[in-house]
């Protein structure tokens, strides 16, 4: 049986920390990271296959750069699954991945107990599996799955 290739995409900081806490779920697969070239991302790159993209940060030029960087990585790596814990850094990878026929798994951040994140709201319509960690979010994500505290 062929292993899935997994793209793990997240912003740096807490989003990346949450992704790393999921390692038991992806460690036996072929995987790589897409994140920001900040201190934690650079540290990750010492031991893991890691690509860096521009942070869109509500800047149209940086977002366009992020789109091209994300597309280049997706075409090179050809993942079968994209898993994201947010935030804006992951948006282009998720949408481009969906257009390329990849499965999208989005995990809403644990720090969002009452209201959905902007990225969560944007990725929800295209996610094959959308996991939220607080029951209060069920009304925002009716097709999502309650995962409880998974980190």
Kindly label every feature range from the protein language model.
Residues 58-80, 99:
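An amphipathic, basic-hydrophobic alpha-helix
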Residues 17-24, 92-95:
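Histidine-anchored nucleotide/phosphate-binding helix
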Residues 8-20:
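A short, glycine/small-residue-rich beta-strand->loop->alpha-helix junction that serves as a flexible
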Residues 10-12, 28-66, 136, 147:
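Conserved nucleotide-sugar phosphate-binding/catalytic loop shared by glycosyltransferases and other
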Residues 81-100:
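An aromatic- and histidine-rich active-site surface loop
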